Amino acid sequence: MSTLANLTEVLFRLDFDPDTAVYHYRGQTLSRLQCRTYILSQASQLARLLKPGDRVVLALNDSPSLACLFLACIAVGAIPAVINPKSREQALADIAADCQASLVVREADAPSLSGPLAPLTLRAAAGRPLLDDFSLDALVGPADLDWSAFHRQDPAAACFLQYTSGSTGAPKGVMHSLRNTLGFCRAFATELLALQAGDRLYSIPKMFFGYGMGNSLFFPWFSGASALLDDTWPSPERVLENLVAFRPRVLFGVPAIYASLRPQARELLSSVRLAFSAGSPLPRGEFEFWAAHGLEICDGIGATEVGHVFLANRPGQARADSTGLPLPGYECRLVDREGHTIEEAGRQGVLLVRGPGLSPGYWRASEEQQARFAGGWYRTGDLFERDESGAYRHCGREDDLFKVNGRWVVPTQVEQAICRHLPEVSEAVLVPTCRLHDGLRPTLFVTLATPLDDNQILLAQRIDQHLAEQIPSHMLPSQLHVLPALPRNDNGKLARAELRHLADTLYHDNLPEERAC
């Protein structure tokens, strides 16, 4: 695709019945024609307010209004970025400053940003209307119902931003173009899942998460399916309500959500025919629980820098403890610490990926940041090993590794050994603790599948006995802590940094004692 084009216009021209549903919201259904008319109307107003290339931060809950405003921004050549509406004020201000936003759109009760560089702020209407005008009528006058002046540009140019979750540092703005957006839509929605008109999609992850944005915002337009949008936070109770009322055929979740839905297995299984998990590796126990109930969960991994999922299990062929194969059009390879490609199976390395969803790069990137895209490959920072069949297994992240007495500790090796063979442990996380006299030592945090029948010391002894048979001694945990739940960020990803801080705090609070086991 070399001619100038506009992503919103391209999505509108896909050959689907305009009267079919595209979004479901608060018990109401919106057709493709209704949304298209509204987007064009809103674009005519935004064109009086914004110039092509202006950045717009959308800190809004999931709704048709958010999806339509996003596509209206792209229609006029503005560059929208959807962020978590629950972001702290400083985080929002930092993102607005980073992208030099001209406009911020927030929920009705959210304050305006202050300071000398504060952008114009619009607010959603109270009461959550089906389609919100965000006060544009009052600001720039009535809409032009005949507007069609799409801003067309190079298909490789940035047309929206996604900010990373910040799990590996400050959030970075990832640029996405028409070309790579259609690339990840085609690879995942069409080639992998074969989504089609009539499919009902429910993504529990929200649109501010790249995984959720593809599922809820883009795939309905791209595949002819329709999606449920929910402006409330996804508690297990709320998710159950949505499953019962909406009866989705395709469910997108993260491992923690599937774990929380175990008591509602009957309701989930009554309609869901295709379940997908991403965000963090799906534990073997979770895969096996749902498989025993007749539901195959396909695990996969994506990255904001690649738009969506690029490595996944195929429906009908999913395996436990496997992240699957590269999606059509993608290539993956593993490299060692020196950057040499690893050819042999069973050897661990850092995953590099290239393919149709690859981002053009970071917004205002430093040289160090942009180096992650060197040579047309994105360095994910994730550790994998590849088996003889070509399937990949996740082994953690390269920044999770640490040394004890000069020897590398691989946390996932310990974590998986525990979760596979000790059914009383639901989740396990190994992090380093800096001790006063002997440097870094491993600290283990666990959550339990069932309450302890005995004390924690006996649990620690069972863990030690099991690990001693298969794990090198320098990886054995020196402390054990049982938690009711593990900390996670807004995308459902494990917050290891919080656990490292907690481990240090607990160690220093309990000096001079060490756990005895």
From Swiss-Prot:
> What keywords are assigned to this protein?
ATP-binding, Ligase, Nucleotide-binding
Gene3D superfamilies from the xrefs? 3.30.300.30, N-terminal domain of ligase-like (3.40.50.12780)
What is the top EC class of this enzyme, as a single word? Answer: ligase
> What is a GO molecular function of this protein?
anthranilate-CoA ligase activity
What is the pH dependence?
A: Optimum pH is 8.5.
Q: Which InterPro entries match?
A: AMP-bd_C, AMP-bd_C_sf, AMP-binding_CS, AMP-dep_synth/lig_dom, ANL_N_sf
Reported EC number(s) for this entry are 6.2.1.32
Q: Name one GO biological process term.
A: secondary metabolite biosynthetic process
Pfam families under this entry?
AMP-binding (PF00501), AMP-binding_C (PF13193)
Q: What do mutants without this gene show?
A: Mutants show no detectable levels of 2,4-dihydroxyquinoline (DHQ) or other quinolines.
Paired cysteines (S-S): none
User: Which residues are recorded as binding AMP?
Assistant: L161, Q162, Y163, T164, S165, G166, S167, T168, G169, A170, P171, K172
Catalysed reactions listed for this entry: anthranilate + ATP + CoA = anthraniloyl-CoA + AMP + diphosphate
Would the keyword tRNA processing be found if you checked this record's keyword annotation? no
Taxonomically, the superkingdom here is Bacteria
Function (record text)? Catalyzes the formation of anthraniloyl-CoA, which is the priming step for entry into the Pseudomonas quinolone signal (PQS) biosynthetic pathway. Also active on a variety of aromatic substrates, including benzoate and chloro and fluoro derivatives of anthranilate.
Q: Which family does it belong to?
A: Belongs to the ATP-dependent AMP-binding enzyme family.
Q: How does this polypeptide assemble, per the annotation?
A: Monomer.
What is the recorded name of this protein?
Anthranilate--CoA ligase
